[in-house]
């Protein structure tokens, strides 16, 4: 197995020659793809030369987003006033996967080789947030909505054939 960790910071700044209309007033802000912390842990264990199990844990900081912080009335309707660019983050991403791997033919001199795996992605069923969007309801209240992908454990069967 192995363990990896990465720390990185990605920021942007827009400069306007006149000093007006620049994003965040010309100050640095986190890029949409900024993920300061990213860690992965992979573990494998062989019971025999044909049967093994594997596990994978994945963690990363949530992506930066811009959120509405207030509302105001304009032209007979409500408009949203937003925070500084990317000053908030969606929840962190975490996932844990497991698999049972079987290699029935394990001869190095064989012309063909096949194996299969049975496993589960996202064993914990964590609802990792992919995107967040905002709107206002009929009373003008700001409503936040989270779009989650793979919000449940996903079983799989994999068959590999090599020649």
Predicted regions and their residues:
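Extracellular loop and loop/strand-boundary signature of outer-membrane beta-barrel proteins
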Residues: 24-29, 83-87, 142-147
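Generic detector of contiguous secondary-structure segments
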Residues: 40, 46-48, 77-88, 105
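C-terminal beta-signal and adjacent terminal beta-strands/loops
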Residues: 50, 59-76, 95, 102-163
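Transmembrane beta-barrel architecture of outer-membrane proteins
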Residues: 6, 30, 34-40, 93-99, ...
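Flexible, solvent-exposed coil segments and beta strand-coil junctions
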Residues: 15-24, 74-82, 136-141
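Gram-negative outer-membrane beta-barrel transporters
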Residues: 1-67
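Outer-membrane beta-barrel transmembrane domain signature
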Residues: 82-97, 163
